[in-house]
Amino acid sequence: MPSVVGNLVVQNSNGSFNLGDFYNVSPKENTKAYNGSGASNVGFVVNTFNGVSATNTFDSDVADQDQIGTA
């Protein structure tokens, strides 16, 4: 099942996106999040008592961890 694809931009995808025939599906994901004090707490009842908090978002490197695809 051959297919011809022009310009394709996927902003956000969960799962896999297949075009045409495929042999091996290996989805990859990169995520970076900056959370302040108590920002990523999860649960039914969460009580946080935070004073003054500052999050450093300066990132001097180009890539944190490259994902290299293998065929």
Curated annotation (Swiss-Prot):
Keywords: Germination, Sporulation. InterPro entries: Spore_germination_GerPA (IPR019618). PANTHER family: SPORE GERMINATION PROTEIN-LIKE PROTEIN YDZR, SPORE GERMINATION PROTEIN-LIKE PROTEIN YDZR-RELATED. This is Probable spore germination protein GerPF. Required for the formation of functionally normal spores. Could be involved in the establishment of normal spore coat structure and/or permeability, which allows the access of germinants to their receptor. It comes from Bacillus cereus. One of its GO terms (biological process) is sporulation resulting in formation of a cellular spore. Belongs to the GerPA/GerPF family. Induction: Expression is sigma K-dependent and negatively regulated by GerE. The keyword Membrane does not apply. The gene is gerPF. It comes from the Bacteria. Pfam families: gerPA.
